[in-house]
Regions:
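Acidic/polar, glycine-enriched structural segments that form the non-catalytic walls/loops
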Residues: 23-346, 366-369, 376-385, 514, ...
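Active-site core of glycosidic bond-cleaving carbohydrate-active enzymes
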Residues: 81, 349-385, 407, 414, ...
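Beta-rich accessory regions
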Residues: 154, 162-165, 173-193, 199-200, ...
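Acidic/histidine-rich catalytic neighborhood
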Residues: 452-509
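Catalytic cores of secreted or luminal carbohydrate-active enzymes
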Residues: 110-129, 649-695, 699-700
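Carbohydrate-binding/catalytic loop surfaces
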Residues: 330-343, 392-412, 468-492, 539-551, ...
């Protein structure tokens, strides 16, 4: 019997190895027959701090340049006014029933002022008309290299270095040498036309008030320096040579001064000492990406969904890196259209930043996901200052619409000054801790941050007639847009979810640190808040206020997903509530959905084990809401009724929610129990994943063949209690593990290996 079990185990391992080898041979990425001619369809490259968009403009091959920390950070003078307060908003809404003064203070300036805002760097251009027809354009996400091949035999290769702040290009087999130009943004008006200028013209770069930067060219090098607002400036240094006949190669560096992420050595000085050629830099670059992709892999029988997942995780690795800012609306791909980006390219904390980091945890990219909590820790002081100035209490609430430094920008008041934003952000500290099982992180950052959020909720809340806590005014993004009834006098399910999650997490964290007095206090606070409001339609927006129209934001269901405060594992009554809520959203129709609605809904459908519905919505997202380069464009690009919105502002959160949904279909551990393939579509007969991460610091690999789970391998990084649903017995296996221990589960055995 032991021999038979061992044989089965070995066969499973061999099949898994062969399966993984087959996966590595599959191409994932982008392939076109022409170079894109629109900036939001360009080939994206990036390393978290600098980014490129490769496209063709006016007969030139254009490498748009971006730097994640290049911001105009001018202060908002209105936010220094004495009337700037939560109490002022409460008085205007509750007593005067009039938002006009609130709009004048918080909203109006964002429609006429051009800053604070993210700003573009410029572009490198090569005239390519003489190269003739393009044969192939290809981005291989496994190497993060873009290759363009022309029918004349010329080849261009491009990458943004994964290990430093440089980019590289190389052309081979050129019929004649190409010239190179560095195009700077136009900050002074010269009468030229601008692409797609909106009516108020607030997006014009010329409104920032800068002088055009200084460009210096000597032989085969160019240096460009641009002064922005205050102490912020940017420098680009570009150099090139011809190391062989018909070959042109070069490199460039982008640096800043005056930001949290600026260098001590600027680009020109750095490039004077930089001696790496294209090939040397490429080896280091591809080594980094090899390591990145070794963290986790998937294989699906649906090649469209599989390729999109790899594209999303490529963008994740390109947009979120240690010692760089986190993912903002467009990350390192600021609009290359002569304007400031949509919504200023800011940090939208009512959904966008949060969704952008959903896939990092279970995809086992903790270093990249840690970038978000690193930034939240960095802006903690500014958040506490904002809390004192606007809410007039101690504790921590972060502006919902924020700059690079976490300061308020403004916009629709119910959301730009949302009263529980930090509760959702606290969830990311919680997830980083739970997936990494890092007690040091818990003690030094996670609990101190979450504790201050909990303290803020205690201080800002009031008691109602039933002695239950409530907010003086509440909101539910982005219900009722910017109207008076977007402010609720009864605490919404969105705000309540943020509050209840924060107290639940704070108590759990305090317990883990042995702080029993703290834990007891947070639990007492939790008991003072009401339960979630619901009716026959499911979860409502607020008590006695059901969702009655199609809406893009699923804020009223936050308690279910992503928080897991409500889960179908909690019994039939809760399961019915969740399913009614999802059904009601679908029943109201998709008229006012946008791309991220489909991907968020797919996550929810995976949580209720409805893989077919999840896959269906993910396919709609790809075909209707994504640019050919995979960028999420928010509106229905097919104009086939998937929403009434047909515009195309580019933001990334929908992309990363897509990746998260795929991962929810393959593995779930949010309840503390690992489940593999919980939401596989009916037609999928085989799938596999390698080294996905579960809560508790467990790395999980599993294969699914002929419509059945074949094997599960779990490695315990830190030790601790493992709970896994054994698909062969349908029983929950619970056991204490040691650091490094490997458990293999097959149809006939569970085997340990130290």
């Amino acid at each position: 019997m032991k021999t038979k079990k061992l044989l089965i185990l070995l066969v499973g391992i061999i099949l898994n190895i062969n399966h993984l080898q087959a996966k590595t041979q599959t191409f994932h990425g982008l392939q076109f027959n022409t170079i894109p001619t629109i900036w939001d369809e360009a080939i994206p490259l990036g390393n978290g701090i600098i980014g490129n968009l490769i496209w063709e403009k006016d007969g030139n091959l254009r490498l748009a340049l971006d730097r994640a920390d290049l911001w105009d950070l001018r202060p908002v003078k209105e936010f220094e006014y004495p009337s700037y307060s939560y109490q002022f908003v409460c008085n205007e809404v509750i007593r005067n029933k009039d938002l006009s003064k609130v709009r004048a203070l918080i909203d109006d300036r964002s429609r006429k002022d051009c800053a604070p805002t993210k700003i573009p760097v410029g572009a490198i251009e090569f005239p390519i008309s003489k190269l003739g027809k393009v044969k192939n354009v290809r981005l291989d996400v496994h190497t993060a290299v873009c290759t363009i091949t022309w029918e004349c035999g010329a080849i261009g290769k491009f990458f943004t270095s994964a290990i430093d702040k440089t980019g590289h290009f190389r052309f081979e087999n050129l019929p004649e040498m190409l010239s190179i130009e560095l195009q700077a943004p136009r900050f002074e008006d010269d009468g030229s036309s601008i692409q797609r200028v909106s009516a108020p013209r607030t997006h014009l770069l010329t409104r920032l008030g800068y002088k055009n930067g200084k460009m210096t060219q000597r032989n085969n090098s160019i240096v460009y320096r641009q002064k922005a607002y205050g102490k912020v400036s940017c420098e680009v240094a570009l150099k090139w040579n011809s190391p062989a006949p018909q070959v042109l190669e070069g490199s460039y560096c982008i640096t800043t001064q005056g930001t949290w992420y600026s260098e001590t050595i600027q680009a020109a000085d750095f490039m004077k000492e930089y001696t790496k050629n294209f090939q040397t830099a490429l080896v280091e670059h591809t080594n980094w990406w090899n390591t990145y992709w070794e963290k986790s892999q998937i294989h699906l029988p649906d090649p469209v969904l599989e390729n999109q997942w790899y594209l999303e995780m490529y963008k994740f690795g390109s947009a979120s890196r240690k010692n760089a800012p986190p993912i903002c609306l467009q990350a390192v791909w600021t609009a290359d259209n002569g304007q400031t980006p949509p919504w200023r390219g800011d940090f939208h904390n009512d959904l966008n930043t949060q969704l952008s980091y959903w896939p990092g945890y279970s995809a086992n990219h903790l270093e990249e996901s840690r970038v978000f909590t690193d930034w939240l820790w960095k802006i903690k002081d500014n958040g506490e200052d904002f809390t004192r100035r606007f809410f007039k209490v101690e504790g921590l609430n972060v502006p919902c619409i924020a700059t690079l430094e976490g300061k308020a920008i403004g916009g629709w008041s119910p959301y730009s000054h949302q009263p529980t934003t930090s509760g959702w952000l606290a969830h990311h500290f919680y997830q980083q801790w739970k997936y990494e099982a890092d007690t040091k992180f818990l003690e030094s950052q996670a609990y101190p941050w979450v504790k201050e959020v909990a303290r803020y909720f205690e201080n800002v809340s009031v008691k109602d007639a039933k002695n239950k806590r409530k907010l003086p005014l509440s909101t539910s993004p982005e219900i009722n847009d910017n109207e008076l009834d977007a402010w609720f006098q009864k605490t919404t399910n969105y705000d309540l979810a943020n509050i209840r999650f924060t107290y639940t997490a704070a108590a759990e964290m305090a317990d883990a640190l042995g702080l029993k007095k703290d834990a007891a206090h947070w639990r007492r606070q939790l008991e003072e808040w009401p339960d979630f409001a619901s009716d026959s339609t499911g979860l409502t927006i607020a008590p006695d206020y059901p969702l009655t129209v199609s809406h893009r934001h699923l804020s009223h269901m936050l308690a279910f997903h992503p928080f897991g405060l409500l889960d179908i594992s909690q019994g039939k009554e809760v399961e019915s509530l969740i399913k009614r809520s999802i059904h009601h959203v679908e029943e109201l129709g998709n008229e006012f959905w946008i791309g991220y609605t489909y991907t968020w809904l797919a996550n929810m459908q995976a949580r209720i084990f409805d893989g077919d519905a999840a896959a269906r919505n993910l396919h709609i997202f790809i075909k209707a809401f994504c640019s050919p380069n995979s960028f999420h464009l928010n509106g229905d690009q097919l104009k086939k009724g998937y929403t009434s919105f047909t515009y195309r502002p580019f933001t990334l959160e929908g992309n990363f929610a897509f990746a998260s949904a795929i991962q929810e279909m393959l593995m779930q551990s949010h309840t503390g129990i690992i489940r593999v393939f919980p939401a596989i579509p009916e037609g999928w007969k085989e799938a596999s994943f390698d080294k996905m991460r579960a809560i508790g610091g467990f790395l999980v690999s599993a294969s699914y063949q002929n419509g059945k789970v074949q094997s599960i391998t779990i490695q315990s990084e830190k030790g601790g209690i493992l709970k896994v649903l054994n698909p062969f017995t349908n029983q929950i296996e619970k056991r204490e593990t040691t650091p490094g221990e490997i458990i293999k589960i097959t149809p006939n055995t569970i085997q340990d290996r130290p």
